């Protein structure tokens, strides 16, 4: 029966020699496992056979109390589970004591949406050259359809149905969806198509760079940020913020969570619930209008 340090050293050699992990990854494993060694030693453990699920849970609680974030704790527990799995494979343990212990879910931080007045100011750009027309069209489509950045740059001309005012989008997991894009976006797309051949006509992409190639995601991010500054917006403008604003404004206006889910291309409704938020004033007005106990004087 070996001691705490010896087993960890053997495991790190296994990761280095047999798994051929990088020095940085090995160092991360070492740091995570040193933390559990220290905790186990403080609690009087002399070998890993004395470790049980209760001790692992106490270790997780203590780590959180000492300020370790949820994501970092998840990584620490993952390293610990892998180590114990290896001990089981070496017949040093009968079962993995960390198997049923999980870290709290990492909170998802939502980007701030752009309010409607600022959206209108952003879209009211001075059209003085073909690239500005292209950018206006991209902004209109991004906000008008709530696209992901990858979906915007992946658009081809053939994906447009100008008669119906719709666009075919290839989303995550190669899932295709058909979306309305609105009159304003449609008008600016047509305006851009009149100028597009100035940059080239061989590429199938809807939006081209000044070199005549499909515009890159990085270029879109850069141009949107520049327009945000030019238009005097206080918040940094990036594509995801436009998608988030689309979702928020649609939900505030319609209250149709399932409809917004379909428009965004979310596989699960829970994603839409996290992704969108209603401001308190809107929620209060919905409550006052709909809840039986809120209808005062009736």
From Swiss-Prot:
Core-binding (CB) domain location is: 2-88
Q: Which Gene3D superfamilies does the UniProt entry name for this protein? A: 1.10.150.130, Intergrase catalytic core
- State the CDD domains in the record: INT_XerDC_C (cd00798)
- The main place the protein resides is cytoplasm
Pfam families xrefs: Phage_int_SAM_1, Phage_integrase
User: Catalytic center at which residues?
Assistant: 148, 172, 240, 243, 266, 275 (o-(3'-phospho-dna)-tyrosine intermediate)
Superkingdom in the source lineage? Bacteria
- What is the similarity comment for this entry? Belongs to the 'phage' integrase family. XerC subfamily.
**Which protein are we looking at?**
Tyrosine recombinase XerC
What is the organism of origin for this protein? Escherichia coli O157:H7
What gene codes for this chain?
Answer: xerC
């Amino acid at each position: 029966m070996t001691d705490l340090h010896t087993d960890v050293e053997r495991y790190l050699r296994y990761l280095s020699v047999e798994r051929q992990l990088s020095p940085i990854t090995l160092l991360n494993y070492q740091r995570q496992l040193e933390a559990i060694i220290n905790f186990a030693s403080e609690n009087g453990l002399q070998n890993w056979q004395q470790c049980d699920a209760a001790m692992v849970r106490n270790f997780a609680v203590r780590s959180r109390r000492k300020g370790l974030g949820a994501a970092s704790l998840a990584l620490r527990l993952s390293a610990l589970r892998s180590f114990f799995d290896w001990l089981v494979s070496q017949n040093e343990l009968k079962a993995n004591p960390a198997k049923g212990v999980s870290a709290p879910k990492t909170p998802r931080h939502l980007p701030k949406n752009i309010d409607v007045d600022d959206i209108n100011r952003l879209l009211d750009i001075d059209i003085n050259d073909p690239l500005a027309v292209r950018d206006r069209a991209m902004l209109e489509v991004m906000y008008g359809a709530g696209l992901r950045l990858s979906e915007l740059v992946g658009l081809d001309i053939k994906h447009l149905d100008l008669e119906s005012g719709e666009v075919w989008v290839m989303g995550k997991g190669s899932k295709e969806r058909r979306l309305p894009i609105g009159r304003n976006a449609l008008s600016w797309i047509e305006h851009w198509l009149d100028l597009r051949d100035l940059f080239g006509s061989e590429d199938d992409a809807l939006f081209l760079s000044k070199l005549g190639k499909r515009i890159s995601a990085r270029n879109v991010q850069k141009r949107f940020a520049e327009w945000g500054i030019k238009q005097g917006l206080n918040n940094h403008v990036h594509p995801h913020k436009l998608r988030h604003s689309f979702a928020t404004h649609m939900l505030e206006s319609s209250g149709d969570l399932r409809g917004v889910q379909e428009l965004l291309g979310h596989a699960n409704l829970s994603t839409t619930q996290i992704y969108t938020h209603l401001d308190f004033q809107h929620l209060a007005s919905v409550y006052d209008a709909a809840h039986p106990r809120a209808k005062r004087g009736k």
